[in-house]
Amino acid sequence: MRQAHPSGLNQVENKCLFNSRGFSLIEILLVVAMTTIVTAISIPQIQSQVDSYRLNSAVAMAKWAIQSTRFQALMKGYPYQTAFSSANANYQIQNLPSGSTYQNVGNQVPLAAWPMTFSADTTINFRPNGSVTATVGSNIFTITYRGTTKTITVSNYGNVTVN
């Protein structure tokens, strides 16, 4: 009569299972090497996406500043302007409620926490009738971050386009 092995498996099956627990050192090293290679390939792509995101957020901030300042001029009934500083990469919103000198509205606002570059100082003036003029610089300016440039164009009536 045949007796069953105490584990319920015959000796050959038991030996195969006993020797096949876990991963070998070669298998682990191959997985680590492949993970390292994939990570090394993806890091430049991720950095490029982060740079693009940072530039796009600065451009969106500038666009928002222009559009909201135009809205304030239309709503309040007196001139407003947005002054972009190329030296400090920030902007200042100003208004002219009465008198001949523009007054700051709030503090200077940095365009981004990263070192952005403006093409030139630009001040865009918004009249209560909806007209827009550039009193310093032009109504076309660029913002650059790590070699990538976006051009912002403001039409005579406040339409903002980005290229």
Predicted region positions:
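N-terminal helix-rich module
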Residues: 1-16, 37, 41-75, 79-163
